[in-house]
């Protein structure tokens, strides 16, 4: 399973990358707005931080022509740029255009198996179903991941499933158990993955006992 970080904060990307399990980055307009810096400065700094990993950068237009124009400009920034496109009929047109040119795409805001099927059918490199937002409206987001995984396996679609809108470590573990390709995770949740209260208690006890060891070698 691959781990992406869902952020536009270069400091968070840098810290996550130090853990040596980061495989990519996803961003969106909301995350970029939080940084409060010029758009091009933000995306260029992200790409410089992880030049060898895929970075999803989202278009802002709602029509295919505008998406293509914006996406081509983004793609010029580097070979690791993935064009993030909303799951709409116009978006699917843009996805087909980019994939036919060898430019990777990430179809975002996927909330149903039907949407995922269409995105996989047109050849999207990645699809991003949002589990947390489904949970917010009293649906079970992970059920969607199971359905999409089954469809993908039935037809051997090449699209990689990015579990998005991850809210907690349970989402990550359930994604791994289902067999999703990728989870894109906020930095706060990445930090939680390595923690367990019993680990902290055990380490504290070991350190305390270590102090009583005579003639310690180091």
Curated annotation (Swiss-Prot):
Give the EC number(s) under which this enzyme is classified.
Answer: 2.2.1.2
The reaction(s) catalysed by this protein are:
D-sedoheptulose 7-phosphate + D-glyceraldehyde 3-phosphate = D-erythrose 4-phosphate + beta-D-fructose 6-phosphate
Gene3D superfamilies named in the record:
Aldolase class I
One GO cellular component assignment for this chain's record is:
cytoplasm
Classification via Pfam families:
TAL_FSA
Q: Locate the active site.
A: 84
Indicate yes or no for the key word Transferase. yes
**Location of this chain's protein in the cell:** Cytoplasm
What GO terms are given for molecular function? Answer: aldehyde-lyase activity; transaldolase activity
Highest taxon listed in the record's lineage: Bacteria
Question: Which InterPro entries does the entry mention?
Answer: Aldolase_TIM, TAL/FSA, Transaldolase_3B, Transaldolase_3B/F6P_aldolase, Transaldolase_AS, TSA/FSA_arc/bac
UniProt keyword terms in alphabetical order: Cytoplasm, Pentose shunt, Schiff base, Transferase
Pathways per UniProt: Carbohydrate degradation; pentose phosphate pathway; D-glyceraldehyde 3-phosphate and beta-D-fructose 6-phosphate from D-ribose 5-phosphate and D-xylulose 5-phosphate (non-oxidative stage): step 2/3
An example GO BP is: carbohydrate metabolic process
**Similarity comment text for this entry:** Belongs to the transaldolase family. Type 3B subfamily.
According to its UniProt entry, the function of this protein is described as:
Transaldolase is important for the balance of metabolites in the pentose-phosphate pathway.
Check the record and name the PANTHER family matching this protein.
Answer: FRUCTOSE-6-PHOSPHATE ALDOLASE 1-RELATED, TRANSALDOLASE
* Record protein name field: Probable transaldolase
Q: What is the lineage of its organism?
A: Bacteria, Pseudomonadati, Aquificota, Aquificia, Aquificales
């Amino acid at each position: 399973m691959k781990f992406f970080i869902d952020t536009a904060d270069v400091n968070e990307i840098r810290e996550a990358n130090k853990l040596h399990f980061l495989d990519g980055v996803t961003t969106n307009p909301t995350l970029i707005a939080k940084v409060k810096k010029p758009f091009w400065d933000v995306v260029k700094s992200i790409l410089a931080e992880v030049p060898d990993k895929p970075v999803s950068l989202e278009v802002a237009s709602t029509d295919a022509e505008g998406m293509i124009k914006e996406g081509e400009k983004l793609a010029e920034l580097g070979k690791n740029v993935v064009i993030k496109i909303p799951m709409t009929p116009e978006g699917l047109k843009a996805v087909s255009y980019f994939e036919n040119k060898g430019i990777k795409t990430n179809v975002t805001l996927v909330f149903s198996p039907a949407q995922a099927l269409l995105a996989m059918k047109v050849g999207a490199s990645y699809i991003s179903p949002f589990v947390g937002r489904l949970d917010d409206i009293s649906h079970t987001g992970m059920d969607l991941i199971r359905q999409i995984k089954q469809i993908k396996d039935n037809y051997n679609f090449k699209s990689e499933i990015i579990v998005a809108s991850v809210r907690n470590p349970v989402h990550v573990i359930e994604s791994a158990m289902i067999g999703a390709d990728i989870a894109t995770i906020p930095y706060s949740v990445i930090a939680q993955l390595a923690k367990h209260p019993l680990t902290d208690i055990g380490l504290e006890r070991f350190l305390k006992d270590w102090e009583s060891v005579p003639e310690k070698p180091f």
